[in-house]
Amino acid sequence: VTVHIVSFSGGRTSAYLVHLMEQRRAAGEDVRYIFMDTGAEHPETYKFIQRLVTEWCIDLTCIRMGVSDELGKRNHIEIIGVGDLKTDLYAWKGLLVKYGAPSIAAPFCSSRMKQELAHNYCVDQFGRGGFETWIGIRDDEPQRIFGRFAYRILRDNGMPAEVMNTFRLDVLE
């Protein structure tokens, strides 16, 4: 049985994915929801998340990074309650101390605070190959992800946006 892990960002498109996946969960599939908390979201985003959890009665696991002091040592996973979500820059401050400020040459924010952490959590909880991850992407995301030049080439050669999104998901796995 595959566990479907939906990485909820706190945005509208991501909420729509939660809505769609709730239909699959109601049909008997094993669907779980996670939120990767950076401590740097807008307060209204946190309110939206809390309201969605309450109104839709979903079980949302909120994960944030606990930064290990040692370079080379894996950062650890901290689970916090939905009611504890707030703009406190907790993980961000830890990253700055350990790695310094991110830059174009070293853009580690999303990879360290979201992607690696989500992957490590899922492997720890469900084992390698025991889960499938889902993310909601806005229609304008392929252009940002691929870059304007590559996006135009793909689009002008007939690749629909939904295929680009699927390709992006395959690349991330």
Language-model segments: what does each one mean?
Residues 1-173:
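Nucleotide-activated chemistry modules centered on ATP-dependent adenylation/adenylyltransferase
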